[in-house]
């Protein structure tokens, strides 16, 4: 038993590997959930947020990306949302208990700035000694780490609750007012609305969303009201549920929004796919059938927009608001525009223009409009991100300015099946099930080349030169040249179902798989020598070439690892190992550097997926040490060389991973080992080689990883998965990269292939442009010289003009200076005069003001004395009024207490009467129900017994009818056979008559010849005698045939009578069946009438119960109003007002209420009578329709009989005509034969008798037809009479 050396990579002793290794770029987009594209913060409109793989990507126009990774151990993002201020990003992840992650984007920017902050070296003036410089640097690094740790804790918050039994949430939304609360909708099985407080990180409210059992209800969205933070709405397939936060802290469901919907025009599909809250507070919801539902801000249904694309069944997947209305996205990459309208019934109208991407037929799942409304970003379900120029004016839209283009570059839309990296160039090639092959530049993060084919591509391989690739398709393999903008095939190999292609390290060979067979082709010739066709067992899944290209290893689905030699220095096939219940998916290896023997040891690593549950716990990677030795016994005679034999020199080692591994690889520097997982989510694990207990894991793919490759310098790693994403990782550790001494080799090659015609065209174009450039230079130099001359002339002219203008300005300045001095002197004189005038006016105004002040002071003293007198009088009046008010209040209180006692006594009496009436009513209602149930049960039993008897009779009649019909069919078949025989005999007779005619002609010719030639009379006479004998024999044969015809007619006669009798019996049976059906229909109508009466009684009972409830509410309202009056017993005015209200409400309104109740009773009686009349009318309509159908079936039967009779009459007419023609011909023949034969007369007599007989039969048939017509008329009259009687009965009813 082989010794197992267990090296576990998942035990408790593992540590995190510290390595500068991270994702550089993600080429892909996840479109499996909707509304997942967001704009970054308001200040930065160039960055877009979207999910790709198992991460969230923040990408900008400069082709750079930031990544927000998911929590390790979860299974991917399920929904996303962004706060209104675009600061907080929240998403949910799939795990055992639902997880919500809230991410602060502003602090993310601060974190990036802190990470990029570097230590600034001091200037020459501030130079310190080495120790102080070191302390300062250490202090800076410590502060930087503390700041980064603090921001990392603040930037991401994880929210979860144990009350959630779901694995994930399907919808999230932030509170629109302060963004401190978030609502989440969990999926099956519990469907909960959970309300979180972000500042405290706790669950505030949990409310179970009711889900009807048996319905296909599924909630997909939840959101806050934009202006009310306690109003939440949940929508989905089959439901719209609004909730309001109650005073008790729990959500209470409001009325459904469709309660008031009564019109049939408002019927719509219940599958709500998308929603949008518009700027005016209205809500728009789209359905799968194209209806756009408009809701008021209170979540009350208003209308279905008349311009909804419901006739096209345009499933509305997403809705995006904009300044003039909203956009609608759906199938076939079509975006519709809706703008605000003045019509109150339909406030939004559909614009005539729309955006449609004609080249794509995918479904739009996400829409994002930039804040300045200049660009529209579209996400489609084929995994593509598109952009289109946008304008809010729909009239400016046309095909030119609405052309779409990829936002960054086209991605794969389905599972990536092939991946390979180029050695000489920074290129990586991928192929996918979406029938495309793409070549990416991983240094510039650009798509270099792409081509779409008609078949799915399963594998791709890059030639080491970087000029060629090989792609495996469903039916063939194509060898292609890589041109600047195209991939052109130069050879095709007809190999089917190839799933793996690998170039040798030198590029002169490439190996392909063909189920269990591996074929090695010479690349430069495209030949496959017979000695390079290797056959194994099981499907080959992976190929690994040795470094010297002398052979390669293969792994298959049956767990076999086989080494195949390409040269002749050993056995062509060597089985290295076999692993039971293992599907091998990847092999890698290296030469053992510790080997000291002559032969080099090879270390091989094998990974795969367990094919049985027995080995499910043993998930590991196998390590094999392979050695070679020389086979001295099997020495080659031709060249005296020794063959090499390969064998496993050490026991296999197991490297436990804890998960299925799909791909493994070792770096070219032999210092790092990479694992790619098969499980979801797809993760890449890195560990040092030789193996240690340090591991680094990045869960980057949403689905399993299908391919993994490493660049030649080990600075980049590439993975591709089933989620259609290609992820580029960057290794910045120089220690773990390949060290290349020659610096010229480090630069990637930039050569590319170009067709010779294109090269010549470009060369000619370059020469032409050079000539044009020289000509343009000459022209420009000449133009510059001329311009310089013109410029100098203009400068001189301007200088002269400037001198003249300076002289004129100087003269003007001197003149203005003199005027200024004169004006200053005049203003000084005016100022002195105004000061004197102001002093005189001031003295006069002060004297007048002092006089007015003295008068006002004396007047104020008089008013104060009057005020004291008025206050004393007012106090005495207030005291008198208070005493009077208290006396009146006491009297009224006593009066109202007496009235209250009387009212209470009346109330008690009314309460007792009500209880007595309710008791009597319950007794009567129970008695009526018992009687009605007994009567219904009795009628049910009688009807069921009658129905059973009728069904039994019907079954017996059906059986008899089928038997008679079978007999009729057999007899009709026999009759047809006899008619066909008779037709054959008549054809024989006609052929004989034709031969007879020919003989008659010959006879006449012979008679003429007798008259003309006397020499041949004897010979002709003999011939005439022979011909006579022949005619006699033919006449006898004719007689025999006539006799047979008569016998056949005798046999047909009784059979036709039997057929007629059977027809009559079938008609009678059909009439009986119709009678049974009518009786059955009448019984059904009686049953339905009884059921309708029962429903009417139930409605009466419900109406009575409603009346009782109304009376109870009336009494309770009175009690409530009385208690309100009692509260104001101390306040006289309020008490008076309340009592007056009670009197007006309950005393004066009694008569009107009684009249209203009486009117309601009369209306109820009228409604009952109307319902009874409507049911009777419906029953009469059903009877009439049934009678019409019976009458129609009878008339069709009669028409069929008539057509049959007309057919028989026409047939007899044709026979009569034919017989008359035959009779005329026979008479002509008889007159010609009278002279030669006496027997012809007898034949003519027999023919005349036969004709007479046919005439008699024809007359009888006419009589039978006339009788049948009379019978049909009688049936029609009877049916008309029955219909008239039924109509009379219905009118009487």
Swiss-Prot record:
Residues 756-1016, 1045-1079, 1209-1285 form a coiled coil. Signal peptide: none annotated. Residues 122-143 have a biased composition (Basic and acidic residues). Gene3D superfamilies: YVTN repeat-like/Quinoprotein amine dehydrogenase (2.130.10.10). It comes from the Eukaryota. Residues 117-143 are annotated as: Disordered. WD repeats lie at residues 72-113, 309-348, 359-398, 411-450, 535-574, 700-739. It is found in: Cell projection, Cilium. Belongs to the CFAP57 family. Associates with components of the nexin-dynein regulatory complex (N-DRC), a key regulator of ciliary/flagellar motility, and might act as an inner dynein arm (IDA) hub or linkage. Forms a heterodimer with CFAP57C. Associates with components of the nexin-dynein regulatory complex (N-DRC) and the CFAP184:CFAP263 complex. This is Cilia- and flagella-associated protein 57 A. It comes from Tetrahymena thermophila (strain SB210). The gene is CFAP57A.
């Amino acid at each position: 038993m082989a010794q197992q050396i267990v090296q576990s990579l998942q035990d408790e002793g593992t540590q995190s590997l510290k390595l500068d290794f991270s994702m550089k770029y993600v080429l892909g987009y996840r479109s499996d959930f909707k509304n997942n594209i967001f704009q970054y913060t308001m200040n930065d409109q160039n960055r877009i947020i979207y999910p790709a793989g198992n991460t969230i990507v923040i990408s900008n126009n400069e082709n750079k990306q930031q990544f927000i990774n998911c929590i390790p151990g979860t299974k991917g993002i399920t929904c996303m949302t962004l706060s209104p201020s675009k600061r907080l990003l929240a998403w949910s992840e799939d795990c055992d208990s639902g997880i919500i992650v809230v991410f602060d984007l502003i602090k993310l920017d601060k974190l990036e700035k802190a990470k990029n902050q570097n230590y600034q070296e001091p200037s020459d003036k501030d130079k310190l000694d080495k120790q102080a410089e070191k302390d300062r640097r250490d202090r800076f690094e410590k502060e930087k780490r503390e700041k980064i740790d603090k921001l990392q804790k603040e930037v991401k918050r994880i929210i979860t609750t144990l009350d959630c039994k779901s694995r994930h949430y399907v919808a999230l939304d932030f509170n629109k007012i302060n963004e401190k609360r978030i609502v989440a909708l969990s999926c099956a099985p519990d469907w909960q609305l959970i309300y979180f407080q972000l500042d405290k990180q706790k669950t505030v409210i949990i409310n179970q969303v009711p889900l009807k059992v048996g319905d296909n209800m599924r909630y997909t969205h939840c959101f806050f009201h934009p202006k009310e933070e306690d109003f939440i709405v949940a929508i989905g397939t089959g439901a719209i549920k609004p909730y309001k936060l109650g005073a008790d802290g729990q959500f209470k469901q409001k009325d459904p929004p469709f309660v008031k919907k009564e019109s049939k025009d408002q019927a719509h599909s219940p599958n709500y796919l998308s929603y949008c809250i518009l700027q005016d507070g209205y809500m728009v919801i789209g359905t799968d059938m194209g209806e756009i539902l408009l809701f008021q801000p209170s979540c009350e249904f208003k209308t279905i927009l008349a311009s909804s694309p419901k006739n096209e069944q345009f499933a509305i997947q997403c809705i995006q608001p904009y300044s003039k209305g909203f956009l609608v996205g759906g199938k076939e990459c079509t975006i519709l525009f809706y703008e605000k309208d003045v019509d109150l019934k339909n406030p939004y109208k559909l614009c005539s223009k729309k955006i449609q991407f004609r080249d794509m037929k995918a479904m739009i799942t996400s829409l994002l409009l930039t804040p300045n409304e200049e660009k529209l970003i579209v996400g489609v379900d084929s995994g593509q991100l598109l952009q289109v120029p946008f304008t809010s004016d729909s009239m400016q839209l046309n095909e030119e300015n609405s052309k779409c283009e990829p936002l960054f570059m086209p991605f794969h839309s389905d599972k990536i099946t092939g991946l390979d990296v180029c050695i000489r160039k920074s290129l990586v090639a991928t192929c996918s099930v979406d029938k495309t092959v793409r070549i990416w530049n991983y240094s510039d993060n650009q798509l270099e080349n792409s081509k779409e084919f008609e078949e799915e591509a399963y594998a791709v391989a890059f030639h080491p030169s970087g000029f060629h690739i090989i792609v495996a398709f469903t039916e063939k393999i194509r060898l292609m040249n890589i041109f600047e903008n195209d991939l052109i095939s130069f050879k095709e190999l007809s190999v089917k179902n190839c799933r793996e292609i690998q170039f040798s390290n030198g590029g002169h060979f490439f190996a392909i798989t063909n189920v269990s067979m591996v074929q090695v082709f010479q690349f430069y010739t495209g030949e496959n020598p017979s000695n390079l066709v290797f056959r194994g067992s099981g499907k080959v899944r992976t190929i690994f070439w040795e470094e010297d290209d002398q052979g390669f290893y293969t792994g298959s689905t049956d767990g076999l690892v086989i080494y195949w030699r390409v040269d002749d220095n050993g056995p062509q096939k060597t089985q290295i190992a076999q692993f039971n219940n293992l599907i091998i998916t990847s092999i890698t290896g290296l030469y053992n550097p510790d080997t000291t023997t002559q032969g080099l040891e090879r270390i091989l690593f094998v990974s795969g997926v367990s094919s049985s549950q027995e080995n499910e716990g043993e998930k590991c990677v196998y390590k094999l040490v392979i050695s070679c030795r020389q086979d001295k016994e099997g020495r080659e005679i031709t060249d005296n060389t020794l063959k090499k034999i390969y064998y496993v020199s050490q026991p296999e080692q197991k490297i436990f991973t804890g998960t299925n591994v799909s791909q493994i690889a070792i770096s070219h520097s032999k210092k790092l080992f990479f694992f790619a997982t098969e499980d979801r989510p797809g993760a890449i694990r890195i560990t040092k080689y030789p193996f240690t207990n340090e591991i680094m894991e990045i869960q980057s793919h949403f689905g399993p990883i299908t391919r993994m490759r490493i660049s030649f310098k080990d600075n980049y790693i590439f993975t591709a998965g089933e989620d259609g994403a290609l992820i580029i990782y960057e290794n910045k550790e120089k220690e773990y990269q390949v060290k290349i001494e020659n610096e010229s080799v480090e630069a990637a090659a930039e050569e590319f292939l170009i067709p010779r015609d294109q090269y010549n065209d470009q060369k000619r174009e370059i020469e032409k442009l050079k000539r044009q450039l020289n000509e343009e230079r000459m022209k420009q130099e000449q133009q510059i010289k001329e311009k310089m001359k013109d410029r100098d002339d203009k400068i001189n002219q301007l200088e002269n003009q400037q001198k003249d203008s300076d002289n004129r300005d100087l003269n003007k300045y001197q003149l203005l200076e003199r005027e200024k001095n004169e004006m200053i002197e005049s203003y000084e004189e005016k100022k002195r005069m105004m000061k004197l005038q102001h002093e005189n006016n001031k003295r006069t105004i002060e004297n007048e003001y002092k006089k007015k002040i003295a008068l006002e002071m004396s007047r104020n003293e008089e008013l104060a004395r009057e005020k004291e007198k008025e206050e004393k009088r007012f106090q005495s009046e207030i005291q008198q009024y208070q005493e009077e008010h208290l006396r009146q209040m006491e009297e009224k209180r006593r009066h109202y207490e007496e009235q209250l006692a009387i009212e209470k006594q009346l109330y008690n009496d009314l309460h007792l009467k009500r209880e007595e009436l309710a008791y009597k009513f319950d007794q009567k209602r129970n008695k009526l129900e018992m009687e009605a149930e007994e009567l219904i049960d009795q009628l049910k039993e009688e009807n069921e017994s009658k129905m059973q008897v009728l069904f039994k009779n019907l079954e017996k009649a059906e059986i008899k009818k089928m038997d008679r019909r079978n007999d009729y069919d057999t007899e009709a078949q026999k009759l047809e056979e006899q008619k066909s025989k008779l037709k054959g005999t008549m054809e024989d007779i006609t052929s004989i008559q034709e031969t007879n005619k020919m003989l008659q002609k010959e006879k006449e010719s012979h008679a003429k010849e007798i008259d003309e030639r006397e020499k041949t009379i004897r010979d002709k006479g003999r011939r005439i005698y022979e011909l006579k004998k022949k005619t006699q024999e033919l006449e006898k044969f004719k007689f025999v045939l006539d006799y047979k015809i008569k016998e056949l007619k005798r046999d047909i006669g009784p059979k036709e009578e039997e057929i007629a009798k059977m027809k009559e019996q079938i008609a009678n049976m059909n009439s009986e069946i119709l009678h049974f059906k009518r009786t059955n229909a009448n019984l059904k109508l009686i049953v339905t009438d009884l059921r309708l009466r029962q429903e009417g009684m139930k409605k009466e009972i419900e109406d009575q119960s409603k009346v009782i409830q109304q009376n109870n509410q009336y009494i309770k309202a009175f009690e409530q109003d009385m208690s309100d009056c009692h509260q104001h017993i101390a306040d006289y005015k309020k008490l008076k007002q309340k009592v007056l209200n009670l009197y007006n409400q309950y005393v004066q309104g009694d008569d009107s209420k009684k009249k209203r109740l009486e009117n309601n009773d009369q209306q109820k009686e009228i409604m009952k009578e109307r319902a009874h009349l409507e049911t009777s009318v419906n029953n009469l309509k059903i009877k009439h329709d049934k009678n019409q159908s019976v009458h129609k079936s009878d008339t069709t039967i009669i028409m069929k009989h008539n057509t049959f009779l007309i057919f028989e009459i026409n047939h007899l007419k044709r026979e009569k005509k034919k017989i008359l023609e035959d009779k005329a011909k026979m008479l002509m023949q008889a007159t010609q034969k009278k002279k030669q034969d006496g027997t012809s007369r007898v034949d003519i007599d027999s023919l005349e008798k036969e004709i007479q007989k046919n005439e008699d039969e024809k007359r009888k048939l006419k009589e039978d037809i006339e009788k049948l017509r009379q019978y049909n008329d009688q049936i029609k009259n009877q049916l008309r009479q029955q219909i008239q009687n039924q109509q009379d009965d219905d009118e009487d009813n």
